[in-house]
Amino acid sequence: MSRYRGPRLRVVRRLGELPGLSRKTPRRAYPPGQHGQARKKRSEYAAQLEEKQKLRFNYGLSERQLLRYVRKARRAGGSTGQTLLQLLEMRLDNTIFRLGMAPTIPAARQLVNHGHVLVNGRVVSIASYQCRPGDVIQSRDRDASRKLIETHMQFPGLANIPTHLDFDKNTLTGKVNGVIEREWIALEINELLVVEYYSRKG
C-alpha cells in the first residue's frame, strides 16, 4: 500500500487529530460518510487497526515502510512500542517538523526532497534518514532555502520543541541532543495496540 495522497482532513475526521499530517482540526467530531455518526462498539482488531492507521498517516508512511520499522523495533529489544515511536520520531522529515522548520511532515519531506536542508554540512535528500545525537540540521545557505523555511516558521505545526532538540531561529540551525522521550511525542497513540496488530499478522 503506497503513501496516502488524498484529502488530509477526511483522514483527520476518521482517525482524530494527526499533528504530523495536517494543522487542521475537524469541525465535526464524527467520521465522514453516510454512517459517520452511528456509534457501535469496536472489536479488538478494529481498535488495533485504527491505531496502526493513525501511526501510518501521521508519519506519512506506506504499509511496507511501517512494517519495516516494526521489525526493526522488535530486533532492538526492550519495549517494541516505545522503540517504534522513537525510530519514527528520529526520521529526518519528522525532526525538521519538530524543530518548527515546517508546519507538517509532508512539508518537511518536500524540504528534504528538494535539497533545502543540510545535515552535518551535507545535503541529505532522504526523508527517512535516521537522525542521531550530535546531528546538526540547518537550512542550506541560499536565499531560496532560507526564505522557504522562514515562511514555514510563521505557521508552526506544534508550539513546543521537544527537549532532545535545540533550534536557533537566527541561523536556522537545529541540533539533536538525544533520543526523544515518550512524553514529548505529540501524537495521541496507543503503541501497544500497533504492536499487537502486527503480532497477530505474524
Swiss-Prot record:
Gene3D superfamilies, alphabetized: Ribosomal Protein S4 Delta 41, Chain A, domain 1, RNA-binding S4 domain
GO cellular component, one term: small ribosomal subunit
CDD domains to which the protein is assigned, alphabetical: S4
Keywords of this entry: Ribonucleoprotein, Ribosomal protein, RNA-binding, rRNA-binding
Region (Disordered): 17-42
Gene Ontology biological process terms, A to Z: ribosomal small subunit biogenesis; translation
UniProt keyword rRNA-binding present: yes
SUPFAM superfamilies in the record: Alpha-L RNA-binding motif
S4 RNA-binding domain segment(s): 90-152
GO terms assigned for molecular function: rRNA binding; structural constituent of ribosome
Keyword Transcription: no
InterPro entries: Ribosomal_uS4 (IPR022801), Ribosomal_uS4_bac-type (IPR005709), Ribosomal_uS4_CS (IPR018079), Ribosomal_uS4_N (IPR001912), S4_RNA-bd (IPR002942), S4_RNA-bd_sf (IPR036986)
Family named by the database record: Belongs to the universal ribosomal protein uS4 family.
Function noted in UniProt: One of the primary rRNA binding proteins, it binds directly to 16S rRNA where it nucleates assembly of the body of the 30S subunit. With S5 and S12 plays an important role in translational accuracy.
Assembly mode: Part of the 30S ribosomal subunit. Contacts protein S5. The interaction surface between S4 and S5 is involved in control of translational fidelity.
Name this polypeptide is given: Small ribosomal subunit protein uS4
Species this protein is from: Acaryochloris marina (strain MBIC 11017)
Higher taxonomy: Bacteria, Bacillati, Cyanobacteriota, Cyanophyceae, Acaryochloridales
Gene: rpsD
